[in-house]
Amino acid sequence: MKFYKNNIKIDGVADDEELRCAFNNVKVILKRNMIKYQTKYPEEHAEKMRYTFDRFFLDAWHGGCWCGMYWMMYEAFHEMPFKRYAEELCLQYYELINSQSIWHTDIGILFLPMCVPDMRFNRSKEAKEALVLAADCFLTKCAANVQNENSKEFLTDKQVKNPNGKKSGFNDLRKNMGGKISNLNNILILMFAEKITGNRKYTSAGENILYNVLKNNIDNSGRAFFKYSSGKKFDDTSLFDLEAHGGYTRAQAWALWGLSNLYTRLGSEKVYNYFFKCFDYLEKASCGKTVLKYCICGSDGDYDDSTSTAIVLCSILEFIKSLPEESCEYKKLMKGAKRYMSGLLQCAAKPEELTEGLLDRGFILHATHEERGVKTSATVSGDYFYVEALMRCLYNWQPYWD
């Protein structure tokens, strides 16, 4: 495998042929998925690797991931069906944000993978407007608590309702308003909004959010906590005793992804130090696993989490662009990248599984724990970050939030 850094090849663990085979498998599956879904979105979690239609329509953050995969396939293979479907999927979200019918605390990862390629390939005015509206939506509906470190208030039922009087699906903002580690990702959409409008208010808000997330969601050991509220750090699940198992891996993954993207854009020494603090904690606590567990210190037989593995791999591949190849930090991150890519390839769909009759399936196994105990489910977000990792490895790819 070879990684690419500004057209410079970086030695890895396997050859290009293995990665291209995996990438072509993704293309085959996505083409078949297009036959079924066309301009509709699937549920985030598959059941036995099979996706079903989204009961909540578009009120879900993984919509950006689904659309983003189509954009990456178009960029890699220049096949127009991928572009046409991506454009049609984008329009549905543009209409929602224009009518202010979508309020989401993960709005950054929702809109960036769909809007930015639309701007890049089509110079879309609608995409620019949607990005700014999404940033405004985040600031007015979701960011008040994370900008104010002393705020302990949550939205009321009345405020949670959208203009049509309906509650926002599973996006219960009262539950999610506590400072989330994933708000690091929302800073990116604020930076984009300032780039488009020239209005300093967006990055000013982003700076406040960054300060509070670093202060409240990451402890001195480097462990990241999914949420912070009412003066307490806590994780996003009651399924496991996370205190006894080193914490919640997904929170650690989101911390690394947000910090890596912010560092390549800000060059902040503080962000640099926090990234390595979080990375070192994960490496030590996970004991060098090729596929991370749902709990950071999980042992063999516990739930795998290939989605978090893919997010961490993409974080490494983003951060490593800023490091000199001879540095110890570069070598440490590359060692982790090799291990995680090896693990993801083992979780990926195999060519012999790609029969003509198998539509609507995901790409990687063990992407979600699922409360009912399904250990082999795929998720849209896990699939997206797996595709992004392959894209970063095979192409001199410019991320859609650059």
Task: Tell me the role of every PLM-derived stretch.
Residues 1-402:
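Glycan-recognition and catalytic cores of secretory/periplasmic carbohydrate-active enzymes
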